[in-house]
């Protein structure tokens, strides 16, 4: 994968307009890889280009970096919602994008599918070691966007549940999730082999959506797999269990940087990462989905709350 990215980097490639986007789709074989905005490339040689995935939560993160940089005196251009990893990674590798919010575990698996690390710090260091030439990662945040095991707050208090291993004292214990979860490494077999926790399994085919949450709250199942940044986790009724043994691949928020980013800009970005905790990302996502706030408003509000530079 590193040689694939180097291929684009060595040609100093820039994508402009729909023709370039179609070329990327043809080269990497991505079905339906269109995006809501066309990537136009850098229009000012001095500007820092901040990009984002075609994913609302990622756009909020990108806007947060962009505003912090602008408030610190940098000229910033935004290229948001430009597609998924197969589309935007060549653009980052080419130098067309300077700052891009990513996720450690997912990006490590993309760059090195054979990687075996699962715990947060190990994943981060492994990722740093396989970044393509000309690219680096800034500091990782505590905030993550990854699979997580969740119980109701009431059940957590009743059984004193703080981490996954504590589930061994719960009986009966039924796990609910998409049918493929039953055979995932971190599914029932992983729970038993790593933590000694035996579970039944009930398929719920909504990818951790409202049906899954309802089944948990109604005690049809006692354990579910939700993304750790899901805004439903802000309702105070659910609890994410810690995973000290690294059963689930850690995937913390981490900015990918081009070599154009100077040390002062890196420091600005690292200050954002230092303040960005798990609850922060959940709350940002809640403001987007529940209050219909714009990414710009969410970023500005959060930066102000943390005492960081903002617009």
Predicted region positions:
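A bilobed periplasmic-binding-protein/Venus flytrap-type ligand-binding module shared by bacterial periplasmic
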Residues: 147-157, 250-263
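Bacterial N-terminal signal peptides that target proteins for export
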Residues: 2-21
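An extracytoplasmic/periplasmic, membrane-proximal ligand-sensing/linker region
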Residues: 57, 184-187, 194, 267-311
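Bilobed "Venus flytrap"/periplasmic-binding protein-like clamshell domains
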Residues: 47-77, 82, 142-212, 293-297
């Amino acid at each position: 994968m590193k040689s694939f990215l180097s291929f684009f980097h060595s040609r100093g490639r820039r994508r402009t307009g729909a023709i370039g986007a179609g070329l990327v789709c043809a080269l990497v074989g991505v079905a339906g890889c269109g995006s809501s905005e066309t990537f136009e490339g850098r229009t000012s040689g001095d500007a820092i280009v901040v990009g984002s995935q075609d994913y609302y939560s990622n756009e909020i993160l990108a806007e947060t970096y962009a505003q912090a940089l602008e408030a610190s005196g940098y000229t910033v251009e935004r290229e948001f919602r430009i597609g998924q990893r197969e589309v935007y990674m060549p653009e980052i590798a080419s130098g067309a994008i300077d700052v891009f919010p990513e996720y450690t575990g997912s990006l490590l698996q993309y760059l090195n599918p054979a990687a075996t690390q699962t715990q947060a710090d190990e994943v981060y260091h492994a990722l740093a070691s396989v970044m393509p030439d000309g690219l680096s990662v800034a500091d990782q945040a505590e905030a993550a966007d990854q699979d997580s095991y969740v119980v109701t707050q009431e059940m957590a208090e009743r059984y004193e549940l703080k981490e996954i291993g504590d589930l061994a004292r719960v009986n009966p214990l039924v796990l609910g999730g998409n049918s493929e979860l039953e055979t995932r490494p971190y599914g029932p077999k992983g729970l038993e082999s790593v933590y000694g926790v035996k579970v039944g399994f009930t398929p719920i085919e909504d990818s951790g959506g409202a049906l899954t949450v309802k089944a948990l709250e109604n005690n049809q199942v006692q354990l579910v797999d939700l993304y750790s940044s899901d805004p439903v986790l802000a309702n105070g009724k659910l609890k994410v269990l810690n995973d000290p043994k690294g059963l689930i691949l850690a995937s913390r928020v981490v900015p990918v940087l081009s070599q154009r980013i100077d040390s002062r800009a890196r420091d600005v970005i690292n200050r954002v990462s230092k303040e960005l905790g798990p609850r922060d990302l959940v709350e940002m996502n809640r403001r987007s989905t529940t209050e219909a706030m714009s990414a710009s408003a969410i970023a500005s509000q959060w930066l102000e709350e943390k005492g960081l530079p903002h617009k």
